[in-house]
A protein has these predicted regions:
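Low-complexity, highly charged intrinsically disordered N-terminal segments
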Residues: 6, 10-11, 17-28, 32-52, ...
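Short hydrophobic segments within beta-strands
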Residues: 9-11, 41, 77, 113, ...
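Conserved, mostly hydrophobic/aromatic
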Residues: 30, 74, 128, 237, ...
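Glycine-rich beta-alpha loop elements in corrinoid/cobalamin-binding modules
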Residues: 43-190
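Radical SAM [4Fe-4S] cluster-binding motif and immediate context
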Residues: 205-300
Length: 300
């Protein structure tokens, strides 16, 4: 049976959110677990936002139409800083208290992840926890800890304490942060025992073992910004440009096996009805087997 219900939010409109590869990878991975049911949620546009507030309609998940506040987890992917106000809109429309400190046992655990989670402090008050790094590494342990805590009747705080011990998980409530006059961080220290002093980012070491390929992509019911199959061919980048955040945080470079990519491409095109495929990475021209892969895709 289903033990853990997850609402996965991309805090922007559907057309943009449906084109996000990171969200689709984790949505696919979560739903492969028989004990987890993951659904999607996006930020409504201004007209719908206004209507939902007027009619007192809480924000709901796409698949079941159940209110977000009834879920165990609300996972919000933070791709860029410009969506931070949409994060607050999502919490507000879901009728979940904006600040983590004001939430009780009936509220979902609100998780932040993605590229912006590497600088969590601007949003720390609004999240119960952040995962730092690539989501594939952390979530299985997190869901298992949640299930174990639920089975013993543990409290929200007991779960967060267990979660804080999982590598890559940052629970802002368990740390004291002080600032210098210019707004930069002066000190960062845990405020209770058993919580690590530093949170280290977690990465998939082997892309052939840790990666969960998408075989059946969800097809949008309206035109999305990227109306094609997206195939991730590698992670990280060898260039090391100083201005590039992604190049720094997704180090080191890890390539996917070319034979696996061929299988993935075949399955995704067959199961989606799309006729175009984009090869996704920070620097696709650096992929070792690019010529072989492109020739295969043209011939197929």
């Amino acid at each position: 049976g289903i033990d853990v219900r997850v609402a996965f939010c991309f805090p922007d409109v559907y057309e943009i959110g449906m084109s996000n590869l990171g969200m689709m990878l984790l949505y696919n991975m979560f739903n492969k677990r028989p004990d987890v049911w993951c659904e999607r949620v996006y930020s409504p546009w201004l007209d719908l936002d206004k209507l939902m507030k007027e009619q007192n309609i809480p924000l709901f998940a796409l698949e079941s139409q159940d209110p977000i506040r009834d879920f165990d987890f609300l996972c919000i992917t933070l791709g860029y800083e410009m969506c931070y106000t949409n994060v607050l809109q999502t919490l507000d429309l879901s009728q979940i208290p904006l600040k983590a400190a004001d939430r009780d046992e009936s509220c979902p655990i609100v998780i932040g992840g993605g590229a912006c989670a590497y600088n969590p402090e601007p949003l720390a008050a609004f999240f119960d926890l952040f995962y730092i790094g690539e989501g594939e590494t952390v979530y299985d342990a997190l869901f298992d800890a949640y299930k174990a805590n639920k089975a013993t009747g543990g409290s929200r705080e007991e779960f967060l304490l267990k979660a804080a011990q999982i590598p890559g998980i940052y629970v802002p409530a368990f740390y004291d942060v002080t600032y210098k006059e210019d707004g930069t961080i002066a000190s960062f220290a845990p405020n209770r025992p058993g919580v690590p002093e530093k949170v280290q980012k977690q990465l998939i070491v082997d892309m052939d073992k840790g990666y969960c390929p998408i075989e059946k992509p969800v097809v949008p019911f309206i035109k999305a910004t990227q109306d094609r199959v997206t195939l991730e061919i590698q992670r990280g980048c060898i260039r090391g440009c100083r201005f590039c955040q992604a190049g720094m945080i997704y180090r080191p470079l890890r390539e996917r096996d070319v034979e696996e990519l061929k299988e993935s491409a075949r399955a995704m095109l067959k199961n989606s009805g799309h006729e175009e495929i984009s090869l996704s990475s920070l620097s696709s021209s650096d992929y070792t087997h690019l010529e072989e892969l492109v020739n295969f895709l043209i011939d197929e």
